[in-house]
Amino acid sequence: MPRGRARFTSRCDHAGVATDKPQTISYPAPEARPHRYDDVAVDPHVIVLFGATGDLAKRKLLPGMAYLDQSELAPNIQIIGTSLEDLTDDEFRTLAKAAIDAFGTHKLTDGQWDSFAQNLTYVPQGAGPEALAAAVARAEAVLGPDVRRLHYLSVPPKAARAVITMLRDADLVDRSRVVMEKPFGTDYDSAVALNDFVHETFKERQIFRIDHFLGKEAAQNILAFRFANGLFEPIWNRNFIDHIQIDIPETLGLDERANFYESTGAYKDMVVTHLFQVMAFVVMEPPTALEPRAISEEKNKVFRSMLPVKCSDVVRGQFTGYRQLPGVARDSDTETFIALKVGIDNWRWAGVPIYLRTGKRMAEGMRIISIAFKEAPRTMFPPGSGVGAQGPDHLTFDLADASKVSLSFYGKRPGPGMKLDKLSMQFSTQEVESAGDVLEAYERLILDAMRGDHTLFTTAEGIESLWERSADLLRDPPPAKTYAQGTWGPNAIHQLIAPNAWRLPFERAWRDKK
C-alpha cells in the first residue's frame, strides 16, 4: 500500500465498515454552522486526571482547573485524580493545595480552596477499572443529570495505550472526551498505529490532541490580526513576503526530563507538535468560518502542501554537558537544538522559505514569529542614507504571556538631509481593557475541550501528514553539532538562513533600545 493512503482515505463509513472512498468534508449552510460560543456555560463535567501527581498536573492542570471552577467558567466539575501512587483523598488534596499555592497565577482564598477541595477525589490506578468506574459514578451522582466526562491523559506516551484500555474496560467511553499530550507518535508508522488504536475506542470527534502553544492568547491573535483586518491579508503572500521565522529559544535545561528527551529530541518534542502548528496559523488560507471543522481543514491543507523536510536544510545541535546528565548515553547524538528551513508548495507561499528554530539552554527565552517583507528599491536614496542597513521591514508577533505585535519600518531621521532610521509601532494586550481576563494556555484548552471545540487541537490527519514529511530527516539525520550553553546555537545556523539573518537577538535588542 503506498505511503499516505491511510491518511487520505477514510478508514470506516458510518456503519463502521472499512472503505477506500476519498475523505471529504461537507459544510452546512452558513446559518446552520456550529459557530463557536465562547461565553456559553459548559455542561457539568467529571474530569478524570491521569498522571495527577506528575509535574504537568502540579504546575498547570490542577491550578488551571481550580481557576476554571472558582471563576465559574466551569462551575460544575468533579475531579478524580489517578496515578501510580497510592494516595488517599486527603493526601491528594494536600498535594493539590501545595501545587496551586506554588504555581497558580490565580491565588485562592481559604474559602475558595475549601469549596474547590470538595470537588477532589483520588483513585490509585492500580485499583483497576472497576474502582475508577465506581468513583466516576459517585461524582456524576453529585453533579446530577446531563453530565459529561473529560479524561485528561497527563502521562508519558508509552502509557497512553494502557490508559485508553483502562477507560474502555471501565466503560467510560460514552459522553466522554479524551485529551492527549504530545508527542503523538515518533514517526509516521507509530502515529498511524497510535491513532488506529485510539480510534478502536474513541471516535475522532472525542479526541483532543493538545498543543499548549495554540492555547496562548498571542497565537490565537494571529487569526484575528490576519482575518479581521483588511490591512495585511492582501499582502500576506509570496509577492510581498520574503521569508518567515518562527523562533522559540529556551533558557531552561532538561532537569529530570533528560531520560525522556534522550529518546525524543527537539524535533519530535517541539517542532512537530508545536512549531508546525503555529506555522499553520500563520500561513493557512482564510477559513469559511471561525469554527473547528473549517479551521482544522485549512490547517490540514497547509500540512498536505508542505514539502518534505530535507536533511540539507536542517541544523541539529546539542549543548555542552548534555551527555553528562543522568539517563543520557555518553555517545548520544540526540539534539537539544534544531533549526530548519521548510517550504509550502501552494499558490500563496511557493518559494517563500520558513525558518524554524528552538533549543534548550540558549541565550534567551523568547517566542516570536517574524514576517520579513520584501525590500523596496534603494537607488533613489543617496549613499549613506541608511536605507536597508537594518534589514527589511518586519512584522513580529511576540508569543510571550505579555504578548506584543510590532511593525518595524524605515522613516526619516529628524534634521537636515535624508537619513533613515528604523521606526516601530507596537501593540500590547496590556493596553486592552480586558487584559486581566486572559486565560492561561492550559485553562483555555481545558475549557475548549469541555465545550467540544477542536479549533486549537491537532487532528489525526494533520499529525500523520507532518510525520510523513519528516521521514527523510528521521531516517538519516545530520549529526548534532555542539553549542555552548547560553548561546544561540551552532554557528551553522547562519549558513542555513543566509543571505538573511535571524531576527533574534536583534529584535530584542532593537526594541529594548527604544
Which residue ranges define each predicted feature?
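N-terminal amphipathic/basic-hydrophobic helices that include classical n-h-c signal peptides
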Residues: 1-16
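Secretory/organelle targeting and membrane-embedding segments
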Residues: 12-180, 184-514
